[in-house]
């Protein structure tokens, strides 16, 4: 029996990989509802390795390249790509962004309008990453938990993990046992605006704080992008909320009539290089530091965990990144 502390994104992904390889798995989760204790409930759900490469290391591509197909096995994935835009005064940001990544094509005003008619006449140039995708994080976590349960994994909700477990996936709650793990605050808002029709992730570039908007269906959109070095998990600040709402209005003036149906803030666990790690401490393996790349990198990291805990099933063609 392999025991796991934490039934958030990382813990469930690891349980899925382990159970698929024939392991008996039990997960302990302090929250009484799937996803309630996970910072992933505030995530954008973008499966966007090439966009993330602009501000991250090469590993976001090498580790995140298979995430779309992995998630498509357990939940709905929208393969609509990502459109990166900038207001006229920040047009140089498009060139800067393009220099730091690949797998895009430049599109002009008419092409932007063809991709997203709601943006017609609003932007004259953009980058289109047609291989990227997005998902609904909360639905994805529920679907992953259902898939894990169907494989025979026991999920013990409302239960503290015992003192010794095989795998620790508790995110920022494990900071006391991982010396260089730090919290990075992220904030978001969910808007309801059925008048605006947008079908794919939009990234709005800005020199100080680039933001993203992700469609959730039924006229709902998630907007986020803040990254604040902070230990505070208090509600979203007025400054951050105003910046998010101004960004939505910049994308489309129709958002001026949007209802703000939810706001939230959470603490993402991150190491100094903002990449996830495996760390062995006695009999416990830690997976942590998914930062803002949880849905993108959790599948590959879960495969590494399964290779470590079930070495007899290891795929030798899978390149591991392990840091002890």
Language model region names:
Residues 2-26:
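N-terminal Rossmann-like FAD-binding beta1-loop-alpha1 element of flavoenzymes
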Residues 3-5, 28, 162-172, 302:
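Short hydrophobic core segments
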Residues 16-17, 47, 76-78, 172-282:
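Active-site substrate-recognition segment that forms the wall
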Residues 20-39:
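Glycine-rich FAD pyrophosphate-binding loop
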Residues 44-115:
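Dinucleotide-binding Rossmann-like beta1-alpha1 core, especially the glycine-rich loop
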Residues 55-65, 85-92, 127-143, 235-239, ...:
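Short beta-strand to alpha-helix junction loop
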Residues 127-161, 169:
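Helical element adjacent to the flavin cofactor pocket in flavoenzyme catalytic cores
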Residues 258-324:
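C-terminal catalytic lobe of FAD-dependent flavoproteins
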């Amino acid at each position: 029996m392999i025991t796991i502390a934490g039934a958030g994104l990382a813990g469930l992904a690891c349980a899925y990989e382990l159970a698929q390889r024939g392991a008996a798995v039990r997960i302990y989760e302090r929250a009484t509802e799937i996803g309630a204790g996970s910072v992933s409930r505030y995530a954008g759900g973008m499966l966007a390795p090439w966009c993330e490469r602009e501000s991250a290391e090469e590993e976001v591509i090498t580790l995140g390249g298979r995430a779309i197909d992995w998630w498509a096995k357990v939940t709905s994935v929208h393969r609509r790509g990502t459109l990166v835009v900038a207001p006229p005064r920040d047009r140089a940001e498009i060139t800067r962004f393009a220099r730091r990544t690949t797998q895009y094509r430049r599109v002009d005003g008419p092409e932007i309008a063809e991709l997203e008619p709601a943006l017609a006449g609003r932007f004259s140039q953009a980058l289109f990453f047609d291989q990227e995708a997005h998902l609904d994080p909360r639905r994805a976590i529920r679907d992953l938990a259902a898939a894990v349960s169907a494989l025979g994994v026991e999920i013990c909700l409302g239960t503290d993990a015992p003192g010794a477990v095989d795998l620790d996936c508790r995110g920022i709650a494990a900071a006391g046992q991982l010396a260089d793990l730090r919290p990075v605050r992220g904030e978001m808002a969910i808007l309801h605006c059925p008048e605006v029709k947008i079908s794919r992730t939009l990234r709005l570039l800005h020199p100080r704080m680039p933001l993203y908007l992700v469609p959730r269906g039924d006229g709902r959109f998630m907007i986020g992008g803040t990254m604040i070095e902070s230990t505070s998990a208090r509600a979203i600040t007025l400054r951050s909320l105003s910046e998010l709402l101004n960004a939505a209005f910049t994308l489309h003036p129709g958002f001026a009539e949007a209802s703000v149906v939810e706001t939230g803030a959470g603490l993402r666990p991150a190491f100094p290089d903002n990449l996830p790690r495996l760390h062995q401490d006695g009999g416990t393996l830690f997976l942590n530091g998914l930062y803002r790349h949880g849905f993108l990198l959790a599948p590959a990291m879960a495969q590494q965990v399964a290779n470590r805990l079930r070495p007899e099933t290891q795929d030798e063609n899978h390149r591991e990144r392990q840091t002890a």
